[in-house]
């Protein structure tokens, strides 16, 4: 009986060693085109929730959501990215670390930030330091993690 228990434990050990808590960064980021869902404040980063900035319960919120949900971001496996926003596109680079879930995004050139929504988008991207999510939902947050931008695939 004792020998049997030891054998079972030895059989389980390789599975325990193979566990990996590191994210597959490419699977998450480079899984297609991402679209903004909303911006969130009063965030509880660990519980993945917050207070949506734009709400469909009023005309101003509906108009903002109509605009920002068309903003897109495509992360490519080679570390480049392409984004779309109101009246323009931009390119840049990205880098993420799956172990500590950090992200760094650089926007090349001078993207069109003449609209408040464009500026908000670019600022959220360039200030992002942390990410969480999977191949369906992606959240990017600044250092304090008190707010975040959330993306989804259409």
Feature map (PLM): residue ranges:
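Lipid interaction determinants
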Residues: 17-154
């Amino acid at each position: 009986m004792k020998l049997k228990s030891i054998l079972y434990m030895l059989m389980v050990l390789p599975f325990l060693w193979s566990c990996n808590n590191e994210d597959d960064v490419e699977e998450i980021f480079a899984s297609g085109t991402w679209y903004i869902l909303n911006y969130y404040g009063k965030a509880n980063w660990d519980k993945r929730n917050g207070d949506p900035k734009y709400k469909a319960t009023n005309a101003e919120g509906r108009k903002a959501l109509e605009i920002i949900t068309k903003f897109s971001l495509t992360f490519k496996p080679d570390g480049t990215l392409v984004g779309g926003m109101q009246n323009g596109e931009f390119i840049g680079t990205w880098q993420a670390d799956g172990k500590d879930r950090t992200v760094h995004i650089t926007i090349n050139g001078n993207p069109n930030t003449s609209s408040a929504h464009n500026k908000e988008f670019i600022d959220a991207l360039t200030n992002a330091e942390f990410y969480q999510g999977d191949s369906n939902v992606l959240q990017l947050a600044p250092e304090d993690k008190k707010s975040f931008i959330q993306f989804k695939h259409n």
